[in-house]
Amino acid sequence: PLVSIFRSTPLSRPISLKVMEVHPLGSQAFVPLSGRPYLVVVARPGEFCADNLRVFLAGPQQGVNYHKGCWHHYSLALDEESDFLVIDRDGPGNNCLEVFLDEEIVIDY
C-alpha cells in the first residue's frame, strides 16, 4: 500500500464542489490526525450522479475507508487545517479518476 500524509485546508463557506473522484481498482482510507471533525462527501458507485450525493460530519476520531468505486470528494477540513493519514492502493493501473462537474454543488452548513 501507499501511505502518505494529506493536509486539508478549509474552504470558505458555503463550500462549492467542482470535482469528485473515484478509485476503481482499490479502496482509499483517511485517518484524521488533527483531532478535528471534517466533512465526508460521497456518491454511489457507477456513473457519477449528483442526485446520489450524501454529506456526513465525521468526528475527530473517526476514519473513513472509501470502498472501491465509491465517488468521493477529498477530505474537507472545517475551520482549521487538518492532517490525515492516507492509505491507498499501490500497483499497476490508474486508480484515481476525476470528474469535473458541469454545475458546482454547494454545501452550506
Regions found by a protein language model. Give the residues of each.
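Residue-level detector of short, conserved catalytic/binding motifs and their immediate flanks
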Residues: 28, 64, 82
